[in-house]
UniProtKB/Swiss-Prot annotation:
Tissue specificity as recorded in UniProt: Expressed in spermatocytes and spermatids (at protein level).
Protein keywords: Cytoplasm, Cytoplasmic vesicle, Differentiation, Endosome, Protein transport, Spermatogenesis, Transcription, Transcription regulation, Transport
Effect of gene knockout: Mutants produce spermatocytes that complete meiosis but do not usually form functional. Show defective vesicular biogenesis during spermatogenesis with morphogenesis failure of the specialized Golgi-derived fibrous body-membranous organelle (FB-MO) complexes. Show disrupted processing of endocytosed proteins in oocytes and coelomocytes.
Binding partners and assembly: Interacts with vps-33.1 and vps-33.2. Associates with the homotypic fusion and vacuole protein sorting (HOPS) complex, impaired by vps-33.2.
Coiled coil location: none
Name of this protein: Spermatogenesis-defective protein 39
Organism: Caenorhabditis elegans
Known role: Proposed to be involved in endosomal maturation implicating in part vps-33.2. May play a role in epithelial polarization through stabilization of apical membrane protein content. May play a role in transcriptional regulation. Plays a role in lysosomal trafficking, probably via association with the core HOPS complex in a discrete population of endosomes. Essential for vesicular trafficking during spermatogenesis; required during spermiogenesis or sperm activation for the morphogenesis of specialized Golgi-derived fibrous body-membranous organelle (FB-MO) complexes.
Family: Belongs to the SPE39 family.
Length: 522
């Protein structure tokens, strides 16, 4: 039996009450003609020469059990078997087939219908011939009701489909997106609607809504039209570039920024894309050289171009140092072995490496300290702090003193010039370095620096109050005693003397200062 398909709004033609449906009964094709055929079949069944014969009682009657089925004439059984008519079938859908089969058999062959046995009348079922007129009327009524229901549902389906595929207004769509509902944007096909969508989204200041509209425009518009619409919408451009940055699409971001006129940002993005070759200078240096003569050649990128040149020179110095120190056979390498490669590290790391392992090299050597300082322009303060840190680790205290002393009159004038500019500089060094920072670097780079070296650094501090503070901070008892004696603060000196170790040199100096009658105490 064919399965009955479920009615759906999307495909109402497949409903079981449709006239063209394969599952519909034969009675629904032409109900009036079927009724006429049914009446004719009834007349043929009970009319003409086929009248029932009188009943003849058998000679040897035998009681018929109630549970034994009634016996029918052989001719009637043959006709029933030949026509495959199941009289007890009560299905309304099978009634049409019964009548059709019976009529075909009736007109095809001249079959004599067996007389009806009077003693055992048959039970009239819903699908029997006598019930066909009333059954047809009932089916006709049901069919008309189903047609009316089908027409009503079809009209409702058309209304729902019209409302479903009718696009909302742009304001309503943006409002639904802000509320978190699903909105179909494919209905907005014109360029005007898409432009209005972007403007309305930007006006909401909601990044999620702006991002959805931008992705929709990118998917449905050509690249030049998309960039033209995005130009002028800073919020949308910022959201889109952030998305490209997260996904790592640097080439696409570079192309987009150039299309909207942001050449400086595009150059920076192009430079950021080369960071993946940070440890591979053979690939990064050619790219940097191409960018230097390309996107970084505009006047607005002059400062960035100088930084790129310094980066390329740093790579060259690092490659030369790595080539020279391939064996690591020097004394410093045995005492302080290398822990990692120098390639890809900042320029200050190259300077520290040169001061650490090549401080005594000839100035003409590519890895020497003067050569590195010549190729890469460092800030004086940063360069001095870096070199002092390397020399402190090597415990080269005389070299540090020599480095900190002013070498020329020009350096002395430069230090004095910083004072006139309002910069506080109380140290005696020729470079603009703070004594506090200098002592911090020394303490950090060496576990136990000599006390006399720290004392010499503090001696160069011109401010007495700052000198006392640094002496207490870095624990230089000799300088603390000297400062308190100069101030004439007897109570502070007596309190500090109690904190010193008994019978130590510093303790004897503090007691001697307290017992000195020539000192004027406050």
């Amino acid at each position: 039996m064919a399965l009955r398909r479920k009615f759906t709004f999307e495909l109402p033609e497949d409903s079981y009450w449709n006239e063209s449906d394969s599952n519909s009964s034969g009675l629904f094709d032409d109900l009036q003609s079927k009724q006429l055929q049914a009446r004719a079949a009834v007349d043929n069944l009970f009319g003409g020469d086929e009248t029932p014969k009188p009943y003849v009682r058998p000679q040897n009657p035998t009681p018929t059990p109630t549970n034994v089925p009634l016996q029918i004439d052989g001719r009637a059984a043959a006709v029933s078997d030949k026509a495959n008519i199941r009289i007890t079938d009560t299905s309304p859908r099978a009634s049409g087939k019964i009548v059709d089969d019976f009529l075909n058999m009736k007109f095809a062959e001249n079959v004599n219908v067996a007389p009806v046995i009077q003693t055992a009348p048959s039970v009239v079922s819903e699908a029997s011939a006598s019930s066909l007129p009333s059954e047809a009327q009932r089916l006709d009524l049901d069919y008309n009701r189903l047609r009316q229901e089908h027409r009503k549902l079809k009209d409702q389906h058309e209304v729902l489909r019209h409302e479903r595929f009718q696009p909302l207004t742009i304001e309503a769509s943006i409002k639904r997106m802000l509320q978190g509902h699903t909105v179909t944007l494919d209905y907005y096909r014109s360029l005007r609607d898409k432009t209005q969508l972007l403007k309305q989204a930007v006006a909401t200041y909601d990044n999620n809504t702006i991002f959805k509209i931008v992705i929709f425009l990118e998917r449905t518009l050509k690249e030049n039209i998309f960039c033209k619409i995005m130009d002028g919408q800073k919020s949308a451009c910022r959201v889109y570039t952030r998305h490209l940055q997260i996904t790592g699409e640097w080439d696409k971001m570079n192309k987009f920024l150039r299309s909207i006129g942001q050449y400086q940002h595009a150059s920076v993005i192009e430079f950021e894309a080369t960071r993946k070759y940070k440890r591979n200078p053979d690939k990064r240096v050619p790219l940097l050289r191409t960018m230097l003569h390309g996107s970084f050649s505009i006047p607005e990128m002059k400062f960035e171009a100088r930084q790129m040149e310094a980066l390329m020179r740093n790579y060259e110095i690092q490659l030369q140092m790595e080539k020279m120190d391939a064996g690591d056979k020097g004394e410093h390498f045995r005492k302080f072995p290398k822990t990692s490669s120098l390639i890809g590290l900042p320029a200050l790391s190259s300077l520290y490496y040169s001061a650490m392992y090549h401080y005594d090299d000839s100035p003409t050597s590519a890895a020497s300290l003067p050569s590195v300082q010549t190729l890469i322009r460092f800030n004086d303060r940063l360069a001095t702090q870096t070199i002092v840190s390397a020399l402190t680790r090597l415990s080269r205290w005389p070299d540090i003193d020599k480095l900190l002393q002013p070498k020329t009159i020009t350096m002395t004038f430069s230090a004095a010039k910083s004072v006139f500019k309002g910069k506080k500089s109380t140290s005696k060094w020729g470079v603009s370095i703070n004594n506090h920072n200098l002592l911090t670097i020394v303490k950090r780079s060496h576990p136990s620096p000599p006390t006399d070296f720290i004392y010499r650094i503090l001696k160069g501090e011109s401010d007495a109050q700052e000198r006392l503070r640094l002496a207490l901070l870095f624990d230089v008892p000799e300088m603390v005693i000297e400062c308190l004696t100069q101030k004439g603060d007897r109570l502070s000196l007596a309190s500090y003397a109690k904190s010193l170790k008994t019978n130590s040199v510093e303790s004897f100096k503090a007691v001697a200062a307290l017992n000195n009658p020539s000192i004027k105490w406050k």
